[in-house]
Amino acid sequence: MIRPLLPEEYDRVMYIWLYANIEAHAFIPADFWRDNFDKTREMLPEAEVWVYEDEEDVCGFIGLTGDYVAGLFVAEEYRGNGFGHALLAHAKSLHRYLQLNVYEQNLRARTFYEREGFSFMERHWDDATRQYELTLNWQS
């Protein structure tokens, strides 16, 4: 079931956020994600966040600010079950256009977004992580 994030679930989604980022971005020091943990948590109430709940456990979430996908994360133990696809499909049902950034080296995420109909827009350098990012967009 997909539903809005509840404040009492902030710790769970931040746990998913931290460990998914560390696992998916081995090319970025883990301390980068740890150092940005509190800042990201503070932004949760300002974002449109939807969670995928399965048997009363939050398995993943998608965070949006307007038409921008700030993040899509699924807990490792729930990957491969279509939860990421379902969360993105939900966001697509609410928006006619979506944009996101993905690290160039994150091949799994790039493949996922391309399969979901996202197209390449531009490549740019992220000073904070010292990595190239790709901007992708989707339009209905």
Language-model-derived ranges and their functions:
Residues E48-G60:
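Conserved beta-hairpin
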Residues H85-A86, Q105-E122, D126-E133:
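Conserved active-site alpha-helix within GNAT-family acetyltransferase domains
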Residues M1-E8, S140:
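Conserved N-terminal entry element of GNAT/NAT acetyltransferase domains
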Residues S93-Q105:
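Conserved GNAT acetyl-CoA-binding A-motif
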Residues Y10, Y15-T40:
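Conserved GNAT-fold acetyl-CoA-binding loop/helix
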Residues K39-V51, Y68:
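A short helix-loop-beta-strand connector motif used in the catalytic cores of GNAT acetyltransferases and
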Residues Y68-R79, V102-Y103:
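A short, internal acetyl-CoA/4′-phosphopantetheine-binding micro-motif in the GNAT/acyltransferase core
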Residues Y78, G82-H90:
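Conserved acetyl-CoA pyrophosphate-binding loop and the N-cap/start of the following alpha-helix
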